[in-house]
Amino acid sequence: MAGPVFEWLMFVGSWVKLSDDTAARLGAVFGIILIGLLAGSVLTAPVGSAPVVVAPLNPHEEAHLPAEQIPVPEGYPPMASDAAEGASFIHNFGDGHDPTRWYKANMTYPSPHPAWLARHIHFFDDRVELELRRMRVGAKKLAGAEYQRRGLYSFGRVEVVMTPAPGSGTVSALFTHTSEQFGAQHDEIDIEFLGKDLNMVTANYFTDGEPYRYLEIPLPFDASKEVHLYAFDWEPDRIRWYVDGELMHTATHDDHPIPQHPSRIIIQLWSGQEEQFQWHGLPTFEDGTRAAYYCISYLKAGDTGPQCSDTFDPVAANAGRAAN
């Protein structure tokens, strides 16, 4: 590129009676400036046109690392003993954030998922809200929220009281998860809501990275407008999904092998990239849309103890919402 500039300046120099030496020096200067401008245009190119380099937002990020190698950053408390043991628990989100038992994801990593921002997790007197926004975070164009229970949990019953986020392109989720980063193959059990159609809840599971099948369970209500309780029983040879205590679907080991590895328990709000659009819809959701979670519980197989369903009444809960 500097060559044509040099030749042009030589021509101009001859026209304005510049010496060859002066024209050469001007050519070199303008060539450097032009190359710098072109480099700047690459560095400020629109999202997606520049090479992507993804790095953690937090160098002490614990999510997606092997459980035995999770670092404890300065000022971050050690895991509570009950969480480390994968014990039964119930957590009302109005009680706020307990960093010895819960983790706010604050990172980006190479995947179709958005960035996860801790500041998109909002606590209120009776709930936590996860927020999804269109914003640039590193190479990501979207920023959602992920909240993890610390520790690894095995067979038992998981319950959640929640309202998913509305809007095409959103995915509000409760799920168990483990993978190679935790020292095991990819196992996962899902309860997910697609904001494009909130008259259904979806269910699936993965065993050693292989999916079962995608289930769409119809609901007689718009899940974003009413509070309800969703649950699954995870047993060695079957999984059963429930809505407000009513059994909706059963998968058995004969259908597809059941996950066997202890896993994290996670809630998320996210939207994916182009390859997910056919599934979750175009991302036309209102910026700042939120999913609300009120209570979550895990009752380990063989245990007795409190669960969200002990005190949750969907009729009373939604009558109260209507009154407000």
Over which residues does each language-model region extend?
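N-terminal secretory signal peptides that target proteins for export/translocation
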Residues: 1-21
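GH16 jelly-roll
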Residues: 20, 44-324
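Bacterial N-terminal signal peptides that target proteins for export
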Residues: 20-29
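Hydrophobic membrane-insertion alpha-helices, especially the h-region
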Residues: 29-40
